[in-house]
A protein has these predicted regions:
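Carbohydrate-recognition beta-sandwich/jelly-roll modules
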Residues: 1-217, 224-233, 237-238
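Aromatic-lined carbohydrate-binding/catalytic grooves of carbohydrate-active enzymes
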Residues: 187-275, 280-283, 287-337
Length: 338
């Protein structure tokens, strides 16, 4: 919020302390990156022909357009660590505030320089090419109006331990201190997690024409029976999630208006399901729905893509696609969504 810049030269990215803790070609150690449950990159491993590690914290920003996708990078936690076994020192770096703007980058020596390093890069102002008119092929570069109303902060945790498991314990301790609800839970308190799928799209032929309609997988009555059977089996702590229960199913229409799926049963059947879960001790029922995306834009459903859909910087609608893993292009067999 306090960054100033010339409007003719907007700040697109910010790289904070890129070489803090960097090691040279003579030192031994490794970096921890948020790949899966924690990936390990050894210093000076000689793999100079491979690309540097780069991953978006929490995944791609869908407000940015893309025409192809080769690799979907996604980090589920905003952490990187550097452990120097030569100096017997290490630190963890956690992106706290503004982590959703961050990208994790790490690389070894022997490529652009002689250092092994890891850093966070923050995308501040997004820009895209916009066509000036349909009568010419001239494009201009447009940017967002200003910086996001956000504060960027990074927390460093220093240690003299360099073992992978010790660094994992350091991060666990940090999380338990920041989020007390993540404390130890006894085995007798562990809940059984159950997800039930209500309705999905299926193609039916009516008078010879293919029509996409909702197909019932787990009706309201069947969902209640499943929970009853689990309760009778002696499972007293259940967290149940019911997905695809309204607005045509899993690939639903806008949640601005809620309508039950006729093929799953009546509204009273759904009320019986929720009432049973409410009166049963140790049972939690979560009616799951999608509120960030609209898979089907129908008339009078409370949503208009031209009016309500998110827009790219180029002022075009944010249309999202399913990607073909072979061609890396948008898969035309599936409809786009917003």
């Amino acid at each position: 919020k306090e960054i100033s810049y010339n409007e003719d030269y907007p700040i697109v990215k910010l790289q904070v302390l890129p070489y803090m803790g960097a090691s040279n070609v003579d030192e031994k150690g490794y970096m921890i990156v948020p790949e899966g449950t924690g990936g390990k990159i050894n210093f000076n491993n000689g793999k100079t022909g491979q690309q540097r590690y780069q991953s978006d914290v929490y995944g791609w920003d869908y407000g940015q357009a893309r025409t192809t996708i080769v690799d979907e990078t996604k980090s589920n936690f905003p952490l990187l660590a550097i452990a120097n076994e030569t100096t017997q020192s290490s630190f963890l770096c956690v992106a706290e505030e503004g982590s959703s703007y961050a990208t994790v980058q790490a690389d070894i020596s022997g490529k652009n320089n002689g250092y092994n390093y890891g850093t966070f890069i923050y995308s501040l102002i997004h820009g895209e090419n916009m066509d000036v008119s349909t009568k010419s092929d001239t494009t201009v570069r447009v940017y967002e109006d200003g910086l996001p109303n956000e504060t960027l902060s990074q927390r460093y945790i220093f240690s003299d331990k360099t073992d992978y498991s010790d660094l994992a314990k350091e991060y666990r301790g940090y999380l338990q201190k920041k989020y007390p609800s993540l404390g130890k839970v006894g085995s007798d308190k562990q809940a059984l997690a159950v997800e039930m799928i209500g309705a999905v799209d299926d193609t039916e032929h009516i008078l010879g024409y293919p029509v996409v309609r909702s197909q019932s997988l787990t009706s309201y009555t069947q969902a209640k029976s499943i929970l009853e059977d689990l309760q009778k089996a002696g499972i007293g702590n259940i967290n149940a999630k019911y997905t695809g229960w309204f607005n045509t199913g899993v690939k639903q229409t806008s949640a601005a208006k809620v309508k039950t799926v006729g093929r799953l049963g009546s509204s009273s059947d759904l009320e019986d399901l929720t009432a049973y879960a409410d009166k049963t001790n140790g049972m939690q029922l979560y009616l799951n729905g999608t509120f960030n995306y609209v898979y089907k834009d129908k008339w009078f459903d409370g949503f208009s893509s031209t009016r309500n859909a998110a827009k790219f910087v180029s002022r075009e609608e944010c249309e999202l696609y399913n990607w073909d893993p072979i061609t890396y292009q948008a898969n035309d067999d599936y409809t786009d969504y917003h």
